[in-house]
């Protein structure tokens, strides 16, 4: 293998590992951080409303116990 071919292979390996590591840094579901935060806020509001109802809170302590 010539020096030029070795250098080309080196660049291809570096490029491939950079692309793979860059893709792994993003959310796995393909949504951006703002969408993930919005979904998290919606879930928190739903649980908050659910746990504020005494019959739901006492019927599902595994969901609402963290609030005590």
Curated annotation (Swiss-Prot):
Intracellular or extracellular location(s): Secreted
Major location category of this protein: secreted
GO cellular component: extracellular region; host cell postsynaptic membrane
Listed InterPro entries: Conotoxin_a-typ
Residue ranges that the Swiss-Prot or TrEMBL entry lists as coiled coil: none
Residue ranges of the propeptide: 22-48
Disulfide cross-links: 51-64
Transmembrane is among the record's keywords: no
Tissue occurrence: Expressed by the venom duct.
Signal peptide: 1-21
GO molecular function, one term: toxin activity
UniProt xrefs under Pfam families: Toxin_8
Keywords, in A-Z order: Acetylcholine receptor inhibiting toxin, Disulfide bond, Ion channel impairing toxin, Neurotoxin, Postsynaptic neurotoxin, Secreted, Signal, Toxin
Family recorded in the similarity comment: Belongs to the conotoxin A superfamily.
Physiological role: Alpha-conotoxins act on postsynaptic membranes, they bind to the nicotinic acetylcholine receptors (nAChR) and thus inhibit them.
Domain topic, free-text comment: The cysteine framework is C-C-C.
Name listed for the protein in its UniProt record: Putative alpha-conotoxin Qc alphaL-2
Organism annotation: Conus quercinus
